[in-house]
From Swiss-Prot:
PANTHER family, sorted: TRIFUNCTIONAL PURINE BIOSYNTHETIC PROTEIN ADENOSINE-3 (PTHR10520:SF12), TRIFUNCTIONAL PURINE BIOSYNTHETIC PROTEIN ADENOSINE-3-RELATED (PTHR10520)
EC number: 6.3.3.1
GO biological process, one term: 'de novo' IMP biosynthetic process
Subcellular location: Cytoplasm
Class of enzymatic activity (EC top level): ligase
Tagged with keyword Transmembrane helix: no
GO molecular function: ATP binding; phosphoribosylamine-glycine ligase activity; phosphoribosylformylglycinamidine cyclo-ligase activity
Family: Belongs to the AIR synthase family.
Organism from which the protein derives: Roseobacter denitrificans (strain ATCC 33942 / OCh 114) (Erythrobacter sp. (strain OCh 114))
GO cellular component terms attached to this protein's record: cytosol
Matches recorded under Pfam families: AIRS, AIRS_C
Protein name: Phosphoribosylformylglycinamidine cyclo-ligase
Pathway where it operates: Purine metabolism; IMP biosynthesis via de novo pathway; 5-amino-1-(5-phospho-D-ribosyl)imidazole from N(2)-formyl-N(1)-(5-phospho-D-ribosyl)glycinamide: step 2/2
């Protein structure tokens, strides 16, 4: 091998430092728009600083969450529609934080690829910033890892990390009791779980990502990339109003596995499936794959992205509050004295 005249450089190995610096410069304005009380510095330092007192806390408990977007990224990569996956990444983390009763404060991302494409990376991270802005948390740092030989051309991976806080004694779940009402908040589609099965179902259907969507006006790929709904501000408003005993983010495992995570030992849930309409995407998947209702309910959100467990006497007030904040709310069931989730009515 003949060496370059002036010796080898990092660029010769496939790592473009200049592209990385250009990316940071491009995303700084988007990150700056996420600034909130408590943020002490912008991007660029070795670590990010956050002042909990400046954010209004006196005796805070910190809550941390991390997540990814799963194989939904494969659809984004194959179609080139990458703008929304950053919102997915944020939502998967911050929606989990509010289930503990915490306000999301700040967010960090990890973006990894084999060869950095500045425009694509910027679109993704600008999506992350938009998600943070909508959730009220600051994008205070991240890592862009350009790793030649680790990923096929054009591929990338994402991970997100978020920290929130609540005052001591305010953690959820708390005071869940038999008879508590289950309020279901509508999802915006599949969100970010079950996409290995989604992709298999699309393969079985014989449709391509750019084919017209069978249940919507845009392409199939674009429809399946609808971002995960952010429930942060609505959930925090409900918590502040009083009467919320628990929240369950309906992700991998569906309603069947996620709701029991916030119920105390000895209690379960009775859910009436006729209390909301199954979104068309789930009906199409069930029909395409010949899926049974039980399998749907333990795999997908089936139209309910977040469940609030609330005191019976506060259910009407909270329903009205959430509806006023733009949520499609359904009273889907109640907490019962037997463990597990039992269903009545039909979904399919």
């Amino acid at each position: 091998m003949n060496l370059p005249k002036n010796g080898m450089t990092y660029a010769d190995a496939g790592v473009d430092i200049d592209a990385g610096n250009a990316l940071v410069d491009r995303i700084k304005p988007a990150a700056k728009r996420t600034n909130r009380s408590g943020v002490m510095a912008g991007l660029g330092g070795f670590g990010a600083l956050f002042d909990l007192k400046d954010a209004g806390y006196t005796d805070p408990i910190l809550v941390a969450a991390t997540d990814g977007v799963g194989t939904k990224l494969r659809i984004a990569i194959d179609t080139g529609h990458v703008d929304g996956v950053g919102i997915d990444l944020v939502a998967m983390c911050v929606n989990d934080l509010v289930c503990q009763g915490a306000e999301p404060l700040f967010f960090l991302d990890y973006f990894a690829t084999g060869a950095l494409e500045t425009d694509k990376a910027a679109r993704i991270i600008e999506g992350i910033a938009l998600g943070c802005e909508r959730a009220g948390c600051a994008l205070i740092g991240g890592e862009t890892a350009e790793m030649p030989g680790m990923y096929p051309a054009g591929d990338f991976d994402l991970a997100g990390f978020s920290v929130g806080a609540m005052e001591r004694g305010a953690a959820l779940p708390a005071h869940v009791a038999q008879g508590d009402v289950l309020l279901g908040l509508a999802s915006d589609g599949v969100h970010s779980n079950g996409y290995s099965l989604v992709r298999k179902l699309v393969e079985v259907s014989g449709l391509s990502w750019d084919a017209p969507c069978p249940w919507a006006e845009q392409s199939l790929g674009a429809e399946l990339l609808t971002p995960t709904r952010l429930y942060v501000k609505q959930a925090l408003a409900a918590i502040d109003a009083g009467g919320v005993h628990a929240l369950a983010h309906i992700t991998g495992g569906g309603l069947t596995e996620n709701l029991p995570r916030v119920l105390p030992e000895g209690l379960g849930a009775d859910i009436d499936l006729s209390t909301w309409s199954l979104p068309a995407v789930f009906g199409w998947m069930a029909q395409t794959g010949g899926m049974q209702e039980a399998e749907m309910l333990k795999t997908f959100n089936c139209g309910i992205g977040m469940i609030l467990v609330v005191a019976q006497e506060e259910a009407d007030k909270l329903t009205q509050l959430l509806a006023s904040l733009g949520e499609d709310v359904a009273r889907i069931g109640h907490v019962s004295a037997r463990e597990g989730v039992r269903y009545s009515g039909t979904l399919l």
